[in-house]
Swiss-Prot record:
Belongs to the bacterial ribosomal protein bS6 family. Residues 94-160 are annotated as: Disordered. Residues 94-119, 125-152 have a biased composition (Basic and acidic residues). It comes from Rhodopseudomonas palustris (strain BisB5). This is Small ribosomal subunit protein bS6. The gene is rpsF.
Length: 160
């Protein structure tokens, strides 16, 4: 039977429990039509690149499906009807990826980075305080002191 990867996005105001119920419902439809769900991953509530149906965030869920195309057609029909599902995408693949998907590996890597601790001084790279001996920033090097500034009246008189 053909293999598919199916991802759907649920509304941001749906609870995690509601998203799990949606996943169970979709899995039931797949298994009822002779398909099989080999892997389910909930990627959690993530920010969207742009607003979709007034949502700035969505719950992402991925399913690996092993079943005929009629299963995918019915799942997509059910998702079109359901108001909690914003978007969905089904892609046919040659084989399912073993282990966690790229999104789950990225989430694990991000968690590891957070565990490393903060920077010394407690700030992020954007804080530029305490740089050099001058107030507000940078090292002046071998530049001498500034020349006195000409007044606007003096500059206008020298041009004439």
């Amino acid at each position: 039977m053909p293999l598919y990867e199916h991802v759907f996005l649920a509304r941001q105001d749906a609870s995690t429990q509601q998203v799990e119920e949606l996943t169970t419902q979709i899995t039931g439809v797949i298994e009822g039509l002779g398909g099989k769900v080999t892997k389910t991953e909930a990627w959690g509530l993530r920010s969207l690149t742009y607003r979709m149906n007034k949502n700035r965030k969505a719950h992402f869920v991925m399913l690996n499906i092993d079943g005929p195309s009629a299963v995918v057609a019915e799942v997509e029909r059910q998702e079109r009807i359901n108001e909690d599902i914003i978007r969905y995408l089904t892609v046919r693949v040659e084989e399912h990826e073993e282990g966690p998907s790229a999104m789950m590996r990225k989430a694990d890597r991000d968690r590891e980075r957070d565990d490393r601790g903060g920077r010394e001084g407690g700030g992020f790279r954007g804080d530029r305080e305490g740089r050099g001996d001058r107030e507000g920033g940078g090292f002046r090097g071998d530049r001498g002191p500034r020349r006195p500034r000409e007044d606007a009246d003096t500059a206008a008189a020298s041009e004439e």
